[in-house]
Amino acid sequence: MSNTWWWLSVVLLILGLMPGMSQQAALAESDYYTAGVVEFKQSILSLSAWSDSLAGYVEIINSENASATDIIVFPESTLNSAGSTTFVPNPEDQINPCLSDPNATYYEEFLVTLSCAARNASKYIVINLTEKQKCEDIPEDTRPCASNGLNVFNTNVVFDRQGVVVSRYRKVHLYGEAKNSTFLPELITFETDFGVTFGHFICFDILFYTPAHQLIVEQGITDFVYPAMWFSQLPFLTAVQTQQGWAYANDVNLLASGASRPSIGNSGSGIYHGRSGTLTSVMRQDSGERAIYVAQVPKYTRSRSLKKRAKRSLQEIQTRQVASSSSFYMKRDYVENYESELLKLDEGTSGAINRTICQGSFCCNFDIAWRSLGTATENGSYYSYRLGTYDGWRNENNVDANYIRNCALFTCSGDSIDDCGKLLPTEGELQQSRVTFTRLAIGVTYPESREFLLFPDTLQDSLLPLEPSQFEWSQRKPTEDSYVQEVRFALKETQELSNLLTFGIYGNYYDNECTFGVGTEEEQLACGYRSGSPGLRILGGWLAMPLIILAIARTMSS
């Protein structure tokens, strides 16, 4: 242990013996709590990199910007690495590393120091770290153990206001990580003194039913902490785009904290209040940052009827920055597997189309109108647009797969499908909008499934999504006993957009098990779908349903 960090530990321990120096900002009876999410530029990983990250964590916890917060969430994988793993206390034991191990003889320095920092600041602190645990501590797990006798996990750790470890969650869906998964997936929650129970999950977990969606369905959790080191992917899965869409679809509070290295595809943090949208968010497009973003978060009542809207953070009022391939590294989705059509935007004119695009029996109807903005100036560049439909597995190498049914308008850097899912290379004013969309509407009839989630999926050239005030979303069953849902997603009539990258519906069917219309009649009956029901009759006509939905909507608005 270096002298510098020995003295830091001593100072924090002394301060830790005097908890409560920061005033509690929220009470159990309050309508709001105050949360902070940290966008954090990680140190280049080495055996000693954790010390620089730790200093950055402590500085943020003690900063003036964080003073009013009840809870602070730090990102995934920005503290330590496989070369500096630590044991983590079992939350059932209510261990306070700051008091029980002040000299860091069992737990690593950073765990003890952050326990003391939480105690000194009197805040709930959520961190993510690389954890080690002896294989013998989990006798029910009979899988082969590493030669050193240790499992290594990607783990969230929660300290309460006293510095006690009150919660621990280990990532279920690893993203190409050389780490262990738990023997069985964990559904983990923790209670707070301000009357909110949080669930938590990590990064790639957001695309799967367990544990994120399962905590909502089975336990009614309305608030989540979400550390991430997300690698953004065009056109459907950039960080803030995904965070906001998930929170909106589930109507929950999401505290999302992201690693911040845009040059390798990492950035994206925000606080989201369900159907009300974003309270604060950021997508960096430079070298990254170490900063906390704070918002008052309205609490959900048990009836989920609270509709108070918190004031947006002043950090939301910022100059729009147009993304380019040089400002942010983007992964690319396999859009060549979509059934797609180039949207022909004739220069110097306005236009409109009503088009249905199907892949197999899954169809999306697009009702679009635009106004031309003229030709690009010399050296200028602009995006082309495609309409696309996809019904199949989302496959990436060496990671868990999920089944999706997507409908979207998305940009391309050229006219070929191979140009889609890419940012333009030009920056600033050299990127020019070719059209303004004056009408955008997508109509789809989706089959129900045992587990599925549909959400609005949008992206602007600032790499931030549209807000709920800018669009209309409806999702309903045509009859009570049907097994399909009619979805309409449209730009509000008062809105016109010229900086759009993506406008679509993301249909996440997870493992696609027990999806209506998929499998044999015996399998459908086993899943609870009754033969000869109105749902089955509706399925037979679902190719025409999107056209009917949009025709009715157009008639009502005219």
UniProtKB/Swiss-Prot annotation:
Membrane topology type, per the record?
Lipid-anchor; GPI-anchor
The tissues where this chain's protein is expressed are given as: Expressed in larvae and early pupae. Expressed in third instar larvae.
* Signal sequence interval, chain numbering: 1-22
EC identifiers of the protein: 3.5.1.-
User: Which residues are reported to be glycosylated?
Assistant: N65, N103, N120, N128, N180, N354, N379
Record GO cellular component, one term: plasma membrane
Q: Sites of GPI-anchor amidated serine lipid linkage?
A: S531
Keywords of the record, alphabetical order, are: Cell membrane, Glycoprotein, GPI-anchor, Hydrolase, Lipoprotein, Membrane, Signal
A molecular function (GO) term = pantetheine hydrolase activity
Which residues form the pro-region? Answer: 532-558
Q: Which PROSITE patterns match?
A: CN_HYDROLASE
Which signals induce this protein? Induced by ethanol.
Where mainly found? membrane
Q: Boundaries of each CN hydrolase domain copy?
A: 33-299
Identify which residues the record assigns to the active site: E76 (proton acceptor), K171 (proton donor), C203 (nucleophile)
A Pfam family: CN_hydrolase
Q: Where in the cell is it found?
A: Cell membrane
Query: Which family is it part of?
Result: Belongs to the carbon-nitrogen hydrolase superfamily. BTD/VNN family.
Q: Which PANTHER family match?
A: BIOTINIDASE, BIOTINIDASE-RELATED
The name of this protein is Vanin-like protein 1
